[in-house]
């Protein structure tokens, strides 16, 4: 099934000029870029995007990290794009990352893990709509 999912290239990766490498990794794996924009989130935007985590101990540090530098929001499309992209991303936990995944290659830590990806169809729809209007997705 053809799906769309959201990829965020996080501040740790944008600051280290890894945008092109990450996008190449995704395209070489068969995913198509349908929309892309570089964004500097403010506190309110970051809190809104991660609202489901409000009240958790990692919420405030995550928001601080996500507003520390620009991010790149990308809509990816492909066969089973959500699960395919999550496999390409690799695990959040550094000890569980498989070699060759984006996080194994580029992540600095559990929080500074270079990329975010939608975890379900419902999340993908909500997250894509957070960053893109329908006419921006080509």
From Swiss-Prot:
Question: Matching CDD domains, A to Z?
Answer: NDPk_I
- Which co-factor is required? Mg(2+)
Where along the chain is ATP bound? 10, 58, 86, 92, 103, 113
Where the protein is mainly located, per its record?
cytoplasm
The UniProt entry annotates the active site at 116 (pros-phosphohistidine intermediate)
Q: Where in the cell is it found?
A: Cytoplasm
InterPro entries listed in its UniProt record: NDK-like_dom (IPR034907), NDK-like_dom_sf (IPR036850), Nucleoside_diP_kinase (IPR001564), Nucleoside_diP_kinase_AS (IPR023005)
Gene Ontology BP annotations? CTP biosynthetic process; GTP biosynthetic process; UTP biosynthetic process
Tell me yes or no: is Iron among this UniProt entry's keywords: no
Family label: Belongs to the NDK family.
Enumerate the PANTHER family for this protein: NUCLEOSIDE DIPHOSPHATE KINASE, NUCLEOSIDE DIPHOSPHATE KINASE DDB_G0292928-RELATED
Q: What is this protein called?
A: Nucleoside diphosphate kinase
Organism encoding this protein = Actinobacillus pleuropneumoniae serotype 3 (strain JL03)
Encoding gene (name): ndk
């Amino acid at each position: 099934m053809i799906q769309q999912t959201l990829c965020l290239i996080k501040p740790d990766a944008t600051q280290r000029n890894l945008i092109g490498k990450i996008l190449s990794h995704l395209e070489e794996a068969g995913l198509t870029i349908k929309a892309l924009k570089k964004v500097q989130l403010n506190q309110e935007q970051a809190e809104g995007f991660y609202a489901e985590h409000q009240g958790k101990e990692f919420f405030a540090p995550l928001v601080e990290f996500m507003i520390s530098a620009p991010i790149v929001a990308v809509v990816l499309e492909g066969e089973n794009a959500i699960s395919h992209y999550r496999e390409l991303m690799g695990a959040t936990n550094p000890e569980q990352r498989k070699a060759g995944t984006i996080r194994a290659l580029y992540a600095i830590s559990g929080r500074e893990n270079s990329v975010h990806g939608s975890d379900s169809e419902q999340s993908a729809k909500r997250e894509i709509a957070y960053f893109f209007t329908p006419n921006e997705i080509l």
